[in-house]
Regions:
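Metal-cofactor-dependent catalytic cores
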Residues: 1-237
Length: 237
């Protein structure tokens, strides 16, 4: 095994396209990070194979903050940009999003997670820093919406490309098979705190790395991943 670096931070997104939740301890199951993308709002009647209501249609989605309640039976509550806190399955939240998006939507719960490709995503901090520098934009890892950011030893941007086809060990027990690069879209032009789209971000990714940034992976061995855990690359998957 060769050491790649360490986990810089771990995240999940309880509601697809809403704000991230930082994790000091990320439980990883065979389906991905537990409760990641567990809920999604769907555009009713959309013929698209990706019918989700996302920041592309409603940039303010990114400024809706989900959290788990402290009840005996925890549930997801969503704080809107106006400061209202609404249950994930409430008509009030659905109607709020419908008014903002100007289209009908419905809530889709999915305990396996609503993913576009694969359940686990990873990206190096070197790639994040390079994209920011090359595009002249603030360094904001969360615009890429990954589960794990890896602080790499060699600090080379796009180093994740070399992880494809290999198995990574994250911490003491978790093993993931890196299956493909992550093809990016206009979502990465949107900052997590709002503001105008920064198209230069996507331009750099398209020109330098075929519109790919970060990688997808499937879970081979479940366990727990924490910031600071070491990351190793094993033999080809």
């Amino acid at each position: 095994m060769a050491r790649v670096g360490r986990i810089a931070s771990a995240w999940r997104y309880p509601v697809k396209s809403m704000a991230a939740e930082p994790l000091e301890s990320a439980p990883v199951t065979l389906q991905g990070v537990q409760a990641d993308r567990m809920y999604a709002f769907v555009q009713a009647g959309s013929p698209s194979p990706f019918p989700w209501l996302t920041g592309r249609e409603l940039p303010a989605m990114l400024r809706h903050q989900p959290r788990w309640s402290d009840d005996q039976r925890p549930r997801v509550l969503v704080r809107t940009p106006a400061g209202d806190e609404l249950p994930i399955d409430s008509d009030d939240l659905r109607l709020h999003l419908e008014r903002a998006a100007e289209r009908p939507v419905y809530l889709l719960p999915n305990y396996r997670g609503s993913f576009d490709v694969a359940a686990i995503t990873l990206m190096s901090d070197a790639t994040v820093a390079h994209i920011a520098a090359a595009s002249g934009t603030p360094e904001e890892p969360l615009r890429f919406r990954m589960n794990f950011y890896v602080e790499t030893e060699d600090r080379q941007p796009w180093c994740e490309n070399g992880w494809v086809g290999h198995t990574l060990r994250l911490g003491d027990s978790v093993r993931v098979a890196v299956t493909e690069r992550d093809k990016r879209c206009a979502m990465i032009t949107l900052a997590p705190h709002g503001g105008d789209p920064l198209t230069r971000v996507l331009t750099v990714v398209a020109n330098e790395n075929e519109a790919m940034a970060g990688v997808y992976a499937s879970v081979l061995t479940p366990g727990v991943v924490r910031p600071g855990d070491e990351v190793f690359i094993e033999d080809p998957a």
